[in-house]
């Protein structure tokens, strides 16, 4: 692997920008502003140099697997395309949020197993550091044994506890939403109704199942999240099980309870871009402004983290270092990845070179992931290294 020196850029170092050179050797940042034996030099004049985005919740890959209801594409094709999209949008660490529900179809046991196996097989070929985030529907009681096996075997990188049962039952009375659920499951309406009835009938078994799975995850050292917490009491109950991340808390009191309790909170970056949630729930930009949002995730749209960070700056909600922490250092800290999310010697070399001339439309010029230059627009900026002195910033 070649050695690379990045010169002339405005480099994000903690809470400030500095005119320093960044030296990459192998998979890591070797040094800042020091002489090096780099074989290649990147002219970053006029560009920002930022840590790569760490996206802990994204399910946009599902649209590559099933772009329309009932239309399936091979998982390897879907993963390769999702990887390309993630990288070109600055996401160098991606957690594919995979729902394992009691439903057949896209969110079935078979699909979860196939996706996990595909990620494990393809991981060495993928450009982004690709991890498996299992979204466990807690009413899916039959999955408990296998999930615990996967946790013990180290196959799950992140585990979320989801419960969409109430909304599923409520949506049965709305024809359009009902049809969408039935199509996704790939069964008849009568069969879907039967499945829902069976699941609801066992709801008394769910709390103990959550406790057992959480105990296994703790022992395995796997970070856990709870999804759509709706009361401070529910958040407190999950915290008692070492579930340290509140993912999309649906109201301000619950988000505040999470932050006050030392937890991380996750909101959707698309929510920031669109000015609100597509579900009509919490407005993410308001949560950011009130200090109640720790992390922004791509959710269903890979371009969103990059754009949302710059949108928050443009709207005078945060400074860029503060906004960038929401998509890089904070998510890295939340999942225990101490080797990324910051530009410093010894850190993993995940770096973005960004043209910010248009404040709300940042353009990624280059992406370095794990020390590899994996995306480049403007090859003239990459040269054979000459003298070890730095270029002056433009």
Task: Annotate each predicted stretch with a short phrase.
Residues 44-115:
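Metal-associated gating/positioning segment near the N- to mid-region
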Residues 52-56, 94-96, 130-134, 157-163, ...:
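Hydrophobic faces of well-ordered beta-strands that scaffold small-molecule active sites
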Residues 261-271, 275-356:
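His/Asp/Glu-enriched, well-ordered alpha-helical/loop segment
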């Amino acid at each position: 692997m070649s050695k690379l020196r990045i010169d002339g850029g405005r480099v994000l170092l903690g809470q400030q920008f500095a005119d320093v050179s960044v030296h990459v050797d192998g998979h890591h940042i070797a040094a800042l502003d020091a002489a090096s034996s780099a074989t290649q030099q990147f002219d970053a004049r006029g560009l920002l140099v930022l840590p790569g985005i760490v996206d802990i919740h994204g399910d946009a890959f599902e649209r590559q697997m099933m772009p329309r209801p009932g239309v399936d594409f091979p998982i390897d094709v879907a993963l390769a395309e999702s990887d390309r999209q993630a990288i070109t949008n600055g996401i160098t660490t991606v957690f594919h949020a995979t729902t394992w529900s009691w439903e057949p179809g896209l969110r079935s046991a078979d699909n979860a197993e196939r996706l996990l196996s595909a990620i494990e097989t393809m991981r060495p070929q993928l450009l982004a550091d690709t991890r498996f985030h299992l979204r466990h529907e807690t009413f899916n009681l039959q999955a408990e044994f296998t999930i615990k096996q996967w946790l013990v075997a180290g196959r799950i990188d992140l585990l979320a506890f989801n419960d969409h049962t109430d909304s599923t039952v409520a949506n049965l009375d709305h024809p359009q939403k009902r049809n969408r659920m039935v199509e996704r499951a790939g069964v008849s309406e009568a069969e879907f109704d039967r499945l829902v009835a069976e699941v609801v009938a066992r709801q008394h078994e769910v709390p103990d199942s959550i406790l057992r799975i959480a105990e296994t995850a703790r022992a395995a050292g796997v970070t856990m999240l709870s999804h759509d917490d709706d009361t401070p009491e529910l958040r407190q109950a999950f915290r008692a099980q070492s579930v340290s991340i509140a993912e999309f808390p649906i109201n301000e009191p619950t988000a505040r309870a999470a932050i006050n309790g030392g937890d991380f909170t996750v909101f959707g970056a698309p929510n920031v871009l669109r000015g609100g949630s597509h579900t009509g729930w919490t407005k993410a930009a308001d949560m950011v402004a009130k200090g109640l949002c720790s992390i922004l995730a791509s959710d269903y749209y890979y371009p969103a983290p990059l754009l949302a960070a710059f949108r928050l700056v443009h709207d005078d909600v945060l400074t860029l270092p503060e906004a960038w922490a929401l998509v890089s250092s904070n998510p890295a800290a939340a999942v225990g990845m101490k080797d990324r999310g910051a530009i410093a010697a010894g850190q993993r070399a995940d770096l973005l070179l960004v043209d910010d001339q248009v404040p709300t439309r940042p353009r990624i010029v280059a992406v370095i992931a794990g020390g590899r230059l994996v995306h480049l627009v403007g090859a003239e900026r990459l040269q054979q290294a000459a003298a070890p002195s730095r270029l002056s910033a433009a």
